[in-house]
Amino acid sequence: MVTQYIPLKEKYEKEVVPKLMKEFNYRNINQVPRIEKIVINMGIGEGSRNADLLNKHLKELAAITGQKPVITKAKKSISNFKIRKGMNVGLKVTLRGLRMWNFLYKIANIVLPKVRDFRGLNPNSFDGHGNYSFGLTEQFVFPEITPDQSPKTQGMDIVIVTTAKTDAEAFKLLEFLGFPFKR
């Protein structure tokens, strides 16, 4: 296996773990919360009727994450949205390992500072089990995407799944990793 320098993973191991052990009085290093995976979801309403649009967004999400997305299908028919069961309605990527750490670094240090009118992440977006969710309204904040190559603006939901038992532990984990939260 190729070892690769990942700044955020090294920061986690050398700085964040000791801080969390001290703050929450953990006796064992295995008690310290860590990030398990990141799930990126992109709902594409027109994707069910426009295969070309779906493929363009599929390539964009693959460029952003470095991994091929899975096409999500509708679980049931909804007549108001003109959706039938089994239609393509979105894209999903689950990142683990090196790609996860690289994506986290990119989000915290490159993407979030480029978001227009960004004043920090909402600290109330934890789910009660230590997982954090937030959304981006456009994909152009990623350096891999330029506005002229994309057919339309498309947002995405990002879920950071941690092993933290409480929201306070997960908040401190993400804060020590450099995520900008509102005060």
Swiss-Prot record:
Pfam families reported for this sequence: Ribosomal_L5, Ribosomal_L5_C
GO cellular component terms listed in the entry, alphabetical order: ribonucleoprotein complex; ribosome
SUPFAM superfamilies: RL5-like
An annotated Gene Ontology molecular function: structural constituent of ribosome
Keywords of the record: Ribonucleoprotein, Ribosomal protein, RNA-binding, rRNA-binding, tRNA-binding
PANTHER family for the chain: 60S RIBOSOMAL PROTEIN L11-RELATED
Protein name as catalogued: Large ribosomal subunit protein uL5
Organism ancestry: Bacteria, Thermotogati, Thermotogota, Thermotogae, Thermotogales
